[in-house]
Amino acid sequence: MTLQEDIIRQLEVKAVIDPKQEIRQSVDFLKAYLLKHPFLKTYVLGISGGQDSSLAGKLAQMAIEELRAETGDEQYQFIAVRLPYGVQADEADAQKALAFIQPDQALTVNIKEAVDGQLRALEAAGLEISDFNKGNIKARQRMISQYAIAGQTAGAVIGTDHAAENVTGFFTKFGDGGADILPLFRLTKRQGKALLKVLKADPSLYEKVPTADLEDKKPGLADEVALGVTYQEIDDYLEGHTISAEAQARIEDWWHKGQHKRHLPITIFDDFWK
């Protein structure tokens, strides 16, 4: 088995999908998890205005609405959370995402004060925090807020990790990589776009340039620039196609570098890192 084949196997990627079937599978998955855990009544998800949170949010709202209709339990709720650092440059896109999702509840928690307070505390301890590290602090603060909301609402936190993000390790460890349930796991970037098209999302939600937008000194830095490889190349790789040797090497290098992110904290019994 080649490394490419092994990665495809581990990430459960299918070369060809039926978007309607994938939507149904994710919705049923989200419903089943709450039904299996009757002490949970809500799903919580941060909404950025990008493709991934728009899709995960819509699937969550659909699941919650079906649960309410099927059980008669009005406690089932989906809580969408805006988590800007100060003023978000593409706030209009986030509002489009909320209009598409139509969440039961929408909260806004501005993380700027918390992040800046953490930076001041670290600097007082004699540490100079890089802009890149600050970006990771932002991502982790967003998860702190989401888990606080989930803790107060008997909730579980949804993550937006998908195959194209997973293979490159393009997420913050214990930041956006920290969640309870991943309804997009197995999907490539283009497959997620196909689901949004079926769900009749505004094209701007899946046609915009993907960006984590975490670094102050590199605002709106495109994912593809940061990764050095395009999503088309990543998706082609994950769907079993042949791509350039350079792109393949880049993807596989990211895969190896990100292995630690795909594991729980390392114990003496783990050997993947050796």
Swiss-Prot record:
Keywords: ATP-binding, Ligase, Magnesium, Metal-binding, NAD, Nucleotide-binding. One of its GO terms (cellular component) is cytoplasm. SUPFAM superfamilies: Adenine nucleotide alpha hydrolases-like. The keyword Nucleotide-binding applies. One of its GO terms (biological process) is NAD biosynthetic process. It catalyses: deamido-NAD(+) + NH4(+) + ATP = AMP + diphosphate + NAD(+) + H(+). Mg(2+) binds at D52, E165. Belongs to the NAD synthetase family. GO terms for molecular function: ATP binding; glutaminase activity; metal ion binding; NAD+ synthase (glutamine-hydrolyzing) activity; NAD+ synthase activity. Pathway: Cofactor biosynthesis; NAD(+) biosynthesis; NAD(+) from deamido-NAD(+) (ammonia route): step 1/1. The gene is nadE. InterPro entries: NAD/GMP_synthase, NAD_synthase, NH(3)-dep_NAD(+)_synth, Rossmann-like_a/b/a_fold. This is NH(3)-dependent NAD(+) synthetase. Catalyzes the ATP-dependent amidation of deamido-NAD to form NAD. Uses ammonia as a nitrogen source. Deamido-NAD(+) binds at R140, K173, D180, H260, K261. Homodimer. ATP binds at G46, I47, S48, G49, G50, Q51, D52, S53, T160, K189, T211. Its EC number is 6.3.1.5.
